[in-house]
Amino acid sequence: MSLVSVHNEWDPLEEIIVGTAVGARVPRADRSVFAVEYADEYDSQDQVPAGPYPDRVLKETEEELHVLSEELTKLGVTVRRPGQRDNSALVATPDWQTDGFHDYCPRDGLLAVGQTVIESPMALRARFLESLAYKDILLEYFASGARWLSAPKPRLADEMYEPTAPAGQRLTDLEPVFDAANVLRFGTDLLYLVSDSGNELGAKWLQSALGSTYKVHPCRGLYASTHVDSTIVPLRPGLVLVNPARVNDDNMPDFLRSWQTVVCPELVDIGFTGDKPHCSVWIGMNLLVVRPDLAVVDRRQTGLIKVLEKHGVDVLPLQLTHSRTLGGGFHCATLDVRRTGSLETYRF
């Protein structure tokens, strides 16, 4: 029986991969890092700081990921952790060379849909070989009967990036490129964020890989930067949490217009370490749904917790102290690969 079987973001959770902060670092500045992550923050890529994150940040984060793993295990969830590797090692192709990033966010590079797990063609050169951290896990999933795909490795040449273009237009359409975290699963419907971490060709490739059973919905003008899981968060069938700074009547995905929306309240700014944060205060709504009536939420976001409880969602309050520093909350730092339930179409 395939150990990979997941159709949406909310069915009762059975198995998950939790990332690691060990060896996390900011990769050397190159055209990809500058265009995708820092073009609004610095005048040139030479100004972007690089190197390991502070030891304190990594130690505290690894301890908090261990707590998350323990709490999920207590709930009967099978938890997997990636192997450790040297993220400072050189990554090179005939076109470029760089060093690595981190293995903190399995959500970014792996997409599980049904009984298929896909290695996505990620936007940053530094993440070109990130799936190696999960190779042993993927081999086990493949042996269990899962379908294992790797998207075509992108060239990621300089022409792929336009740092001076407006946000949302800095990733060109020369080849399929997308981070897995640009995708949300709603049964047969998949939301695909067209942004600086996912282009139009990426959506086209994903549709061709999954076939006619699924409908990939490219969403444009929703959020210009990277990833979608701090913009729209499905809680259960018919109920979705939305970011009021990004989602409105004009850009709400058509297939979600019949869903009840919960507007995320103002979030607590949890701060960050270093020169600039890796993500905004909205990382506070980056929660992990364990089952339709339970979610893992940052304990500091008391306003959000009250709103969720009002809508029948109990909360397991935990903490990732450095989520703004490392660029990921509970959804980013995990990858759910098996949930109970079957494939359905959700229209209301």
Swiss-Prot record:
KW Cell wall biogenesis/degradation (keyword) present: no
Matching Gene3D superfamilies: L-arginine/glycine Amidinotransferase, Chain A
This protein's UniProt keywords: Antibiotic biosynthesis, Streptomycin biosynthesis, Transferase
InterPro entries: AmidinoTrfase
GO MF entries: glycine amidinotransferase activity; scyllo-inosamine-4-phosphate amidinotransferase activity
Reaction(s) catalysed (UniProt annotation): 1-amino-1-deoxy-scyllo-inositol 4-phosphate + L-arginine = 1-guanidino-1-deoxy-scyllo-inositol 4-phosphate + L-ornithine
Domain of life, per lineage: Bacteria
Top-tier EC class: transferase
Active site as annotated: D179, H227, C332 (amidino-cysteine intermediate)
EC numbers: 2.1.4.2
TM region positions: none
Gene Ontology biological process terms, A to Z: creatine biosynthetic process; streptomycin biosynthetic process
Keyword Transferase: yes
Pathway(s) it belongs to: Antibiotic biosynthesis; streptomycin biosynthesis
PANTHER family: GLYCINE AMIDINOTRANSFERASE, MITOCHONDRIAL
Quaternary state and interactors: Homodimer.
Reported function: Catalyzes two non-consecutive transamidination reactions. It converts scyllo-inosamine 4-phosphate into N-amidino-scyllo-inosamine 4-phosphate and N1-amidinostreptamine 6-phosphate into streptidine 6-phosphate.
Family: Belongs to the amidinotransferase family.
Protein name (Swiss-Prot/TrEMBL): Inosamine-phosphate amidinotransferase 1
Native source organism of the sequence: Streptomyces glaucescens
Record gene name: strB1
